[in-house]
Amino acid sequence: MFKRIALVCALFSGICFAEGKQLLDKVVAIVNDNVITSSELNAQVELSKKQIIAQNMQMPDESVLRKQVLQHLIDVDLEMQMAKQNGITIENAEIDEAIEKIAASNHLNLSQMRDEITKQGISWQEYRQNIRKEMLISRVQQKAVGKDIIVTNEQVEQYLKNAGRIENSNLTYHLKNIVIPLSEEPTTKQLQRAKIEAENLLNKIKKGEDFSRLAIEESSGEFALEGGDLGERHLAELPEVFAKEVVHMKVGQVAGPIRAGNGFHLIKLVAVGGENQRHVITQTHVRHILLKPDASMVPSEAIKQVNNIYRQIQSGKDFALMAKQYSLDAASAVKGGDLGWVNPGELVPEFEKTMNSLPLHKVSKPVKTQYGWHLIEVIARRQKDDSEAFKKQQVRQFLQQRKFVEAVQNWQQHLRSQAYINIVDKDLA
């Protein structure tokens, strides 16, 4: 995204000229050996304005918005630099797949998706580049901190035990957030200054100033340009210091300043969601016969044999006997191919898709998966209340997300502390 321009040119004038003294672009900031130009800043400011209008938020002062957007671009550039250093790339096919999923989740086809993007004043190429950037940043964050995120069974059980003592622990909480940042190792003066700044913002909010506008203008949080909107979160997803507050807050109330690792926070409770409903799943009792190429059977022979077995079963041969005689899945073959009761998501997608489409007691045509060729028969289906297991899995995911967010914030803080950042345009400093 960012253009590389000779540092000497940027340092002395902030403006670079081509051979004919033609103006190229103005440098507004230097981030290590990268630069951010005024055209890049202007484009992102315009995009942010459109988002603010679309979300019906108060528009902040132009100069304040430009400063905030520049800080966002600096953070993005630092992470993009880390992605490059680590050799992380995103293939076009991966972008295509991501866009298809986004379109499907919005009940649009690709043509409709293009139209919607164009209506927002964004070219399709720009949109693809933004998706690429988001995927790169997500991947570099995972590489930087993901391997260290571990949630044990004991932590899940302890959370559930503690949550049982907290009223409304099963609810979801829609929050907005303002972050006044701190360095990795703040001095006493820096702590006092940040806390006073947070208290001053809290007083402004109490006097009627708009929380979202102040978040855009003052917050250093990841969602500052979205008005500090964190969206709807389960209690387990929130930092513990937030969770302790929100269960006692009323909708519309603002709490803080709250001290966390990356700074002082103000949080606003926008809405409270309903309790999680019962989670019921469809279990399937299924059996299969597996044929796969090996040293004694080339692929063409495997296909020929599985089709032959299919024809024999269609002619009345017993599925279980054929499984015992021919299936190469040793564990299930001795049981007549019986896999027992399986839950959604336990089997490979190609197998599960065919299984779910089968009527009871009808044998599928040969199905190819990574393991070989399968013949599948559904023996029975039943509904099961999976609420307890589902709740534990949700809590595990929420705790992982909480740890991940906190680790990413600390990593971003460290990136900034180690970087050379020079805001050349002093109006933006």
UniProtKB/Swiss-Prot annotation:
<keyword id="KW-0413">Isomerase</keyword>
<feature type="domain" description="PpiC 1">
    <location>
        <begin position="170"/>
        <end position="271"/>
    </location>
</feature>
<dbReference type="InterPro" id="IPR000297">
    <property type="entry name" value="PPIase_PpiC"/>
</dbReference>
<dbReference type="InterPro" id="IPR050280">
    <property type="entry name" value="OMP_Chaperone_SurA"/>
</dbReference>
<keyword id="KW-0143">Chaperone</keyword>
<dbReference type="InterPro" id="IPR015391">
    <property type="entry name" value="SurA_N"/>
</dbReference>
<keyword id="KW-0574">Periplasm</keyword>
<dbReference type="GO" id="GO:0051082">
    <property type="term" value="F:unfolded protein binding"/>
</dbReference>
<dbReference type="GO" id="GO:0003755">
    <property type="term" value="F:peptidyl-prolyl cis-trans isomerase activity"/>
</dbReference>
<dbReference type="Pfam" id="PF09312">
    <property type="entry name" value="SurA_N"/>
</dbReference>
<dbReference type="InterPro" id="IPR027304">
    <property type="entry name" value="Trigger_fact/SurA_dom_sf"/>
</dbReference>
<dbReference type="Pfam" id="PF13616">
    <property type="entry name" value="Rotamase_3"/>
</dbReference>
<dbReference type="InterPro" id="IPR046357">
    <property type="entry name" value="PPIase_dom_sf"/>
</dbReference>
<protein>
    <recommendedName>
        <fullName>Chaperone SurA</fullName>
        <ecNumber>5.2.1.8</ecNumber>
    </recommendedName>
</protein>
<keyword id="KW-0732">Signal</keyword>
<dbReference type="Pfam" id="PF00639">
    <property type="entry name" value="Rotamase"/>
</dbReference>
<dbReference type="GO" id="GO:0050821">
    <property type="term" value="P:protein stabilization"/>
</dbReference>
<feature type="signal peptide">
    <location>
        <begin position="1"/>
        <end position="18"/>
    </location>
</feature>
<dbReference type="GO" id="GO:0043165">
    <property type="term" value="P:Gram-negative-bacterium-type cell outer membrane assembly"/>
</dbReference>
<keyword id="KW-0697">Rotamase</keyword>
<keyword id="KW-0677">Repeat</keyword>
<feature type="domain" description="PpiC 2">
    <location>
        <begin position="281"/>
        <end position="380"/>
    </location>
</feature>
<dbReference type="GO" id="GO:0030288">
    <property type="term" value="C:outer membrane-bounded periplasmic space"/>
</dbReference>
<comment type="function">
    <text>Chaperone involved in the correct folding and assembly of outer membrane proteins. Recognizes specific patterns of aromatic residues and the orientation of their side chains, which are found more frequently in integral outer membrane proteins. May act in both early periplasmic and late outer membrane-associated steps of protein maturation.</text>
</comment>
<dbReference type="GO" id="GO:0042277">
    <property type="term" value="F:peptide binding"/>
</dbReference>
<dbReference type="GO" id="GO:0006457">
    <property type="term" value="P:protein folding"/>
</dbReference>
<dbReference type="InterPro" id="IPR023034">
    <property type="entry name" value="PPIase_SurA"/>
</dbReference>
